[in-house]
Curated annotation (Swiss-Prot):
Its EC number is 6.3.4.19. It catalyses: cytidine(34) in tRNA(Ile2) + L-lysine + ATP = lysidine(34) in tRNA(Ile2) + AMP + diphosphate + H(+). Pfam families: ATP_bind_3, TilS, TilS_C. This is tRNA(Ile)-lysidine synthase.
Length: 430
């Protein structure tokens, strides 16, 4: 008799979203969760299938998943994602798009369940080893991980692929076979198809031993988290930036550990040792009058006022003007800068009937702002207000006609100050 144990100790939430590709692993997971729901009628179970559009069979896989979910009475969400070349490689990009879709689909109070198993854990460990990862990377996957404000659960992580297949055959489950899984040009497929069978032939318990090593690495990381918690608290500001002064007296090893944890808190990719060295040498230790910047995909690390900042890369908008003909409705800004709106109640005067409204990102001449004596150029105001250089040509400036009224969240000009109680506020949702 085939025994398969779903780690139900993870299932404290009664609302579960199961990732369902239609393959063997996710079919077994969904079947197990359906059985769990039968024993616990208060459980709400949904499934999500991601249509990557990479295979000519993708549409038929959707139909298969719909059929299975209809039979098991599981509501199914199908999300279609578009994969553009972002330099990450197709595997990494597909994974990124997949998890972004998961995060957007999760409902309040719902947890995400995925079907990774012991063999997957072994593959993940070996891929991290190939990259030269330290204990954090070698920790591989946890059974429970924070994700999108909730939890990502892997209830099958202790089970082997062979056990899952035996369970599926015994219960007459049907699943799809993704032809790309047979392409050993992909690193993970190479391990699964060629390397691991040889290792397991010599050492049958190799995956279980690797999983134990991953667990030990994870324990070491948790211990480091505890030991470095006080240092991390001292270094991180209320804005989430990293103060450099405490790092200057630390050993290289301790400083690197703090940098890694700060980046993890900012949801940054795990940096390599070379990347950490570049952050320190090229950004943190750049000359005082420099504005150093190091790019990581669509993000960058900058230094300002003796702090490190992890920010989204945005092109300067100093030549951009966005007309706002209907100022009573929100206005979308370019370059992913969000939206602005004018809401009742505030210290800005409303535009007069003859005044056109626009958003710009530069302002010439001498400006007079509320709360300051004398006039200043915009560059001087940015400096006085502590606005980082990269925000100075991406912060929305509200104009009525050719008159600057306000900078979102920073200042109001005297010409823009409300003259009565009918004022408005400029709200920027970045």
């Amino acid at each position: 008799m085939t025994t398969l144990t779903l780690n139900t100790s993870l299932l404290s939430s009664r609302r579960i979203l199961a990732a369902f590709s239609g393959g063997l692993d996710s079919t077994v997971l969904l079947h197990q969760l359906v059985l769990w729901r039968e024993r616990h009628p208060d459980v709400t179970l949904r499934a999500i299938h991601i249509h990557h559009g990479l295979s000519p069979h993708a549409d038929s896989w959707v139909r298969h998943c719909e059929t299975v979910c209809e039979r098991w009475q599981v509501p199914l969400v199908v999300e279609r994602v578009t994969l553009a070349d972002n330099g990450l490689g197709i595997e990494a990009h597909a994974r990124e798009a997949r998890y972004r879709a998961f995060a957007q689909t999760l409902l309040p109070g719902e947890v995400l369940a995925t079907a990774q198993h012991l063999d997957d854990q072994c593959e993940t460990f070996l891929l991290a080893l190939k990259r030269g990862s330290g204990p954090a990377g070698l920790s591989a996957m946890g059974e429970r991980s924070p994700f999108a404000g909730t939890l990502l659960l892997r209830p099958l992580l202790r089970e082997t692929r062979k056990t899952l297949e035996q369970w599926a055959v015994r219960h007459g489950l049907c699943w799809i076979e993704d032809e790309s899984n047979q392409d050993d040009a992909y690193d993970r497929n190479f391990l699964r198809l060629r390397a691991l069978p040889l290792l397991q032939q010599r050492w049958p318990h190799f995956p279980a031993a690797v999983a134990r090593s991953a667990t030990l690495c994870a324990e070491q990381e948790r211990l480091l988290d505890e030991l470095l918690a006080s240092d991390l608290t001292d270094c991180i500001t209320a804005e989430g930036t990293l103060r450099l002064s405490p790092l200057m007296s630390m050993s290289d090893v301790r400083r690197a550990a703090i940098l890694r944890r700060w980046l993890a808190m900012r949801n940054a990719p795990m940096p390599s040792r070379d990347a950490l060295e570049r952050i320190w040498q090229e950004v943190a230790l750049a000359r005082d009058d420099a504005s150093p910047c190091l790019r990581f995909g669509d993000r960058e690390i900058r230094r300002y006022q003796s702090q490190l900042w992890w920010i989204k890369s945005v092109a300067g908008q100093h030549e951009t003007t966005v007309a706002w003909p209907v100022w009573q409705t929100p206005l979308a800004l370019p370059a992913g800068l969000g939206t602005v709106q004018l809401v009742p109640g505030g210290e800005l005067r409303r535009p007069r009937e003859e005044e056109s409204v626009s958003i710009r990102f530069k302002a010439p001449g001498v400006l007079h702002i509320v709360g300051r004596n004398g006039g200043r150029k915009l560059k001087k105001i940015w400096q006085e207000q502590g606005i980082p250089p990269w925000r100075r040509d991406t912060t929305p400036l509200l104009f009525y006609g050719e008159t600057l009224i306000a900078a979102a969240g920073v200042f109001v000009t005297r010409e823009g100050a409300a003259e009565d109680k009918e004022g408005v506020s400029l709200v920027w949702h970045a």
